[in-house]
Amino acid sequence: MSRFFANGSDSESESSEEEVQASNFNKAANFQFSDDEEEVKRVVRSTKEKRYENLTSIIKTIRNHKKIKDIPNTLSSFEDLTRAYTKALPVISKEENGITPRFYIRCLAELEDFINEVWEDREGRKNLSKNNAKSLGTLRQKVRKYIKDFEEDLARFREAPDQESDVEEGEGEPHDSDGDRAGADSDDGVGAGTGKLAELPKAAKSAPTKAVADEDDSDDSIDWDSDTESETESSEDENLYQNMRERFLKRTTEKEDKDDDKRKDKRKEQKHKVRKRAEDDEDGEWETVVKGNVVEKPKMFEKDAEIDIPLVLAKLIEIMSARGKKRTDRRLQIDLLFELRDIAEQHALGTPISVKIHFNIISAIFDYNQKISEPMKLEHWALLLEVMQSMMKLLLANPDIIMNESVAEEHEEYVTAPFYIRGCPLAAVERLDDEFTKLLKECDPHSNDYVSRLKDEINVVKTIELVVQYFERCGNNNERCRIYLRKIEHLYYKFDPEVLKRKRGELPAAGTAPSSVEVMDKLCKFIYAKDDTDRIRTRAILAHIYHHAMHDNWFQARDLVLMSHLQDNIDAADPSTRILYNRMMANLGLCAFRQENIKDAHHCLVDLMVTGKPKELLAQGLLPQRQHERSAEQEKIEKQRQMPFHMHINLELLECVYLVSAMLLEIPYIAAHEFDARRRMISKTFYQQLRSSERQSLVGPPESMREHVVAAAKAMRCGNWQACANFIVNKKMNTKVWDLFYESERVREMLVKFIKEESLRTYLFTYSNVYTSISIPSLAQMYELPLPKVHSIISKMIINEELMASLDDPSETVVMHRSEPSRLQALAMQFVDKVTNLVDVNEKVFDMKQGNFFQRGNMGNRDRGYNRNQNNQGGNWGGQRRDNRNQRNRNQRGHHKQQQQQQQQQVQTIEEE
């Protein structure tokens, strides 16, 4: 064996090296290696180690990005992490039996908490840069979507999360698990030729034992151990690789590597535990470090103080005096008020003082959120509901307590009945209702959060009902009108199916609770009689009409609209009242449509739909196309006026009802005035839809709701009622529109009936010039209508002079009079009108070129342009053109008459001679 492999020592002399070179001249030359090259070990790592190392490095990167809130890089690192995990899935399935590593679950949990924390910080989110804000939304969506596959693992992790020390050691978990599994086989896997390797685990195990035994040593000794760690490793390497050949041989197994990793990880773990125990012994328990100076909670009263009403009131005034001041801890203020309430109840100071403290707690909760436009936190909202209901129950249970804002503070009475307290529960419940609306607007309407917040409406309505009972007992008319309006606004848009069942006789009317229509009628009539302000009365009328329309009380709703004259002065109302008016008109149109009043439905909806922005008029959202027309401040104000999602009216339903109503009115009118050049449009929007469809060279099958209505209109123009009905009433239209109606089957039957009748009218208008007489039974069979109904339709058309015909009852035929012009005659008349207009235009152009336009009597003397006739300046140009033509004709007639007179005189002279 060569001495190169036999001896790995560096202490050989130069002479010995020369001897070796001289004796082995023809053999391979020896090489000297630097210390760096000798320290590099060739290691064959398993696939699992590679994958896990990649995952842990990415997790470290994500943690670093989270510390500095670098959200774009966090997003890119998260994408890298998901890709790395996908690559590691085969290894996890094989080695871990498909169980996700705990360090990976910990990373996902930390990332989710980080995103939620940043997302809930509204002030911090506003200060984020555009790139960070955009990346935050993308990261939130991706993480929420990704962690759905790990919900069970995350739930188990959150039940028993790791401690901080475990989190730091978590990166070594994969290696620990490998080492534990490989530890049992480490002794068997080492051959006889590597005896030093077999002895190494024993030496490694002795080091932790010694470290545990020396737990009472000082921190200096611990630091000394950590400093000499590298020296120990180098000495172990020297002892291990006594033979240079062993150092450079490629290892045939991975168990040696696992042994090394196991030794190092255990050594680090033991030293870390020793250091942690030493710190625990010195410092005791862990304490949370609070930023800034720790403010001690002020003491309520002195230890030996006698707690009575004046002392509690003085303390209450002291706490509330800090209200609205700078650097006031509003959370601490609320806590102090709750503590003061508990003290007052413990010392039995009476219900009046408890009510006073309750009211101040409500005020403090309202003050916690300084920005009025933003909603309050959910914890404060729940607290507010609880305190408000508790206060109202105390007021109702004690009739001798009177709370009113007109009571002066010096006249408050807490000792003898009747008790007078300064405060306004009406203002508190109004603010509570406004906060509830803001909470609903802030939530995503398609999320579970919105449903959870909407459930709170039950408690809000209960609170309003408690306030209603209180003011019915001791309130004035103005206060009762205000609280009644709040109750109405929570009731008017809700549909009560029992009302329709009672109307049809399906439910007994007596012996049951009053229906919502009866409650609305009672509340609104009180406001009509007692209200002094126009706004409350106007809003009550609008809500009353809306509620009647919801329950198909068409005539009551219509009469209220006509008698109140709201349409005359609604433009002077505030924006929220105008929004309520638009909502009322939309719902009134739907009610008219359900009650077969097609023309009234069209009249109610035309003002909303002709503008092209019903979404904005109903306060159901802002159109992005009109964003440039409003400033940021205007947009913010308009968003505050938006209606909560559960109060929205379906816009597609609204548009479909409007277009169908327009079709049933417009198509027969077009057929009746086909050759009338001056016919007016009933519905401009529908007419535009129809014309745009006719301009298309190739029209496919209808897909959207508008296309279905346009296709139905084309079929109706030909009198084909079956095709028209199939386009309007089909599976797709039922799902989109008609199933949204209560009793949708009745609405569909009504639609088919109207389509048959209007198709019959259109057919008679279109083909009346073809027939000399038409059989009424054949028309009834063609349109599947009863014979009396067909007779009635034709009679109305004849009476209204829409159809020039007469009825022959014995033969049951309609005899056409042919008084209207034929198609050729109508086209000829149109042609004559157009030619006449063309002649007028040509004459005007000719007059301008010839100069006759400036004759005297039209635009003044041409030679005296500065002295033109002021009476004709800017007059009717068509009249001037006619005057010019008449003047020329008169001049010509006068000239001819003079010539005739001259000729007659000449003839007489000749005869006399």
UniProtKB/Swiss-Prot annotation:
What are the GO MF terms of this UniProt record?
Answer: RNA binding; translation initiation factor activity; translation initiation factor binding
**A Pfam family per the record:** eIF-3c_N
BP term (GO), one: formation of cytoplasmic translation initiation complex
Q: Establish whether keyword Mitochondrion is in the entry.
A: no
State where composition is biased (Acidic residues). 11-20, 162-171, 214-239
Q: What is its main location?
A: cytoplasm
InterPro entries with a match to the protein in the record:
EIF3C, EIF3C_N_dom, PCI_dom, WH_DNA-bd_sf
* Matching SMART domains: PINT (SM00088)
Q: Which positions bear Phosphoserine? A: 34, 165, 177, 186
Q: Where is the composition biased (Basic and acidic residues)?
A: 172-184, 244-263
UniProt-annotated stretches for the region Disordered: 1-22, 157-285, 856-913
Q: Where is the composition biased (Basic residues)?
A: 264-276, 887-898
Supply the alphabetized keyword list: Cytoplasm, Initiation factor, Phosphoprotein, Protein biosynthesis
Domain named PCI: residues: 645-821
Query: What is the protein's quaternary organization?
Result: Component of the eukaryotic translation initiation factor 3 (eIF-3) complex. The eIF-3 complex interacts with pix.
Q: What does this protein do?
A: Component of the eukaryotic translation initiation factor 3 (eIF-3) complex, which is involved in protein synthesis of a specialized repertoire of mRNAs and, together with other initiation factors, stimulates binding of mRNA and methionyl-tRNAi to the 40S ribosome. The eIF-3 complex specifically targets and initiates translation of a subset of mRNAs involved in cell proliferation.
The name of this protein is Eukaryotic translation initiation factor 3 subunit C
What is the originating organism of this protein?
Drosophila mojavensis (Fruit fly)
